[in-house]
Amino acid sequence: MKAILLVLLYTFTAANADTLCIGYHANNSTDTVDTVLEKNVTVTHSVNLLEDRHNGKLCKLRGVAPLHLGKCNIAGWLLGNPECELLFTASSWSYIVETSNSDNGTCYPGDFINYEELREQLSSVSSFERFEIFPKASSWPNHETNRGVTAACPYAGANSFYRNLIWLVKKGNSYPKLSKSYVNNKEKEVLVLWGIHHPPTSTDQQSLYQNADAYVFVGSSKYNKKFKPEIATRPKVRGQAGRMNYYWTLVEPGDTITFEATGNLVVPRYAFAMKRGSGSGIIISDTPVHDCNTTCQTPKGAINTSLPFQNIHPVTIGECPKYVKSTKLRMATGLRNIPSIQSRGLFGAIAGFIEGGWTGMIDGWYGYHHQNEQGSGYAADRKSTQNAIDGITNKVNSVIEKMNTQFTAVGKEFNHLEKRIENLNKKVDDGFLDVWTYNAELLVLLENERTLDYHDSNVKNLYEKVRSQLKNNAKEIGNGCFEFYHKCDDTCMESVKNGTYDYPNYSEESKLNREEIDGVKLESTRIYQILAIYSTVASSLVLSVSLGAISFWMCSNGSLQCRICI
């Protein structure tokens, strides 16, 4: 009975002790992040770094509309294919759009030399001035300028030709040697295009140009080339057995370009003074154009985001996030929402001794829960919380700033003879994408591991801060909690939280209560020992008596022979 009273006294004393616990915030977030060691870790707060949404529209880029080529391509637009007449007045754009069925290009069959390089040059041009470099009415008085038309380039049901070129043929029975120069006074680069005609027979050569042994020379300070017509029988394309090759060059400001020929020259009529601009480009897309505005355009649609990565399309125009192949890039900013005692981090201390977060603490990441005679409640440790918020915010901003190198990534063009180069380029591009994706994912994994360990370390530090103040005035009872050996009112609790706890002031009371509790425990232990001895002796006596009774009964009924020797 005495032992029971002592145990109840000890239990009653412990139940009424004031307590202070250290813990951390928890909420109903379902955000998950990956770390180096774990996948799908639920956290209280996180930020997404990967944009995966677009509006499905082609928009203005920073307020400037794109140039949609419709059924025409770059070649048809610049040469002046009659089917592209609506594009001839275009002078400025944010980017150029071709579609998958942009078939109106070179109407007279032939090769467009260095066409892919020309597209690359245009990808950095935001506007140009189309001007008459050699006026048709006055530049070629000794040559015919109106007979150079073909059924391969029809317009309104009649034979026609490129609007930006003039196909010169003989006048009468004469094709005098021509020599014409243009001096670039535009203070901009000037794009000049021309053509060389290759007839199928010598008869066609004479009927068009009179001169059997004709030549063409085009020269500037950076371009010099002499051309000879290649007369040969070829299969008909678009009804033409002849071929026409197309050439271009850029004439620098102040430079001169000269055309000299005795036949077969398709001279430029219009040229283009180009203005370069960053952020332009050429995309191939069947997405419709809408009246909207964006800072980043992809062939699939516009992206309006400040995130550093996107997985929508590798081809982008404007200020765009970097393309990666990832499907998830989420960076932890808060704590583990369901902590595990077994969790072990890679970089810092672990607060694994605290099994669960507190949903009741909403004004901070780390803090306290106290209970005394005046009541109980939660209180955040604002200093450690604010330091953590500042540190993590700076880290996230730094990561975004470092990785958010926004840029235009236009596609590269290769002709049908450059398939090996195209395949090699694709492999190189894929390699870069793999590296960027790996770097981005590894960065997020490492930073998430650091962040979660950083939070655990902060909780551990807060616990150590309290333990170092209380010393033996309280005891650790597990799960981040302390039980005081003295009365600790709200003022006392606040002093522990703010680091001003007066240990000597409470040490005498704590010592007495600690000795009293230890004495109760010791007396209880002695009583238990006495009871244990008594129980053992009593059990032995009962066992001996039982064995004797059984033996007597067995001897009396003959089941057991009993002999008594003296």
From Swiss-Prot:
Transmembrane regions listed in the UniProt entry: 530-550
Positions on the Cytoplasmic side per record topology: 551-566
Membrane topology label: Single-pass type I membrane protein
Residues bearing a lipid moiety (S-palmitoyl cysteine): 555, 562, 565
One MF annotation (Gene Ontology) recorded for this entry: host cell surface receptor binding
Posttranslational mods: Palmitoylated.
Compartments reported by the entry: Virion membrane; Host apical cell membrane
Organism field: Influenza A virus (strain A/Swine/Indiana/1726/1988 H1N1)
Disulfide bond residue pairs: 21-481, 59-292, 72-84, 107-153, 296-320, 488-492
Glycosylation sites: 27-28, 40, 104, 293, 304, 498, 505
Additional remarks: Major glycoprotein, comprises over 80% of the envelope proteins present in virus particle.
Family annotation (InterPro entries): Capsid_hemagglutn (IPR008980), Hemagglutn_HA1_a/b_dom_sf (IPR013828), Hemagglutn_influenz_A (IPR000149), Hemagglutn_influenz_A/B (IPR001364)
Residues of the site described as Cleavage: 344-345
Protein name, entry field: Hemagglutinin
Family under the similarity heading: Belongs to the influenza viruses hemagglutinin family.
Gene designation per UniProt: HA
Signal peptide positions on this chain: 1-17
Alphabetical UniProt keywords: Clathrin- and caveolin-independent endocytosis of virus by host, Clathrin-mediated endocytosis of virus by host, Disulfide bond, Fusion of virus membrane with host endosomal membrane, Fusion of virus membrane with host membrane, Glycoprotein, Hemagglutinin, Host cell membrane, Host membrane, Host-virus interaction, Lipoprotein, Membrane, Palmitate, Signal, Transmembrane, Transmembrane helix, Viral attachment to host cell, Viral envelope protein, Viral penetration into host cytoplasm, Virion, Virus endocytosis by host, Virus entry into host cell
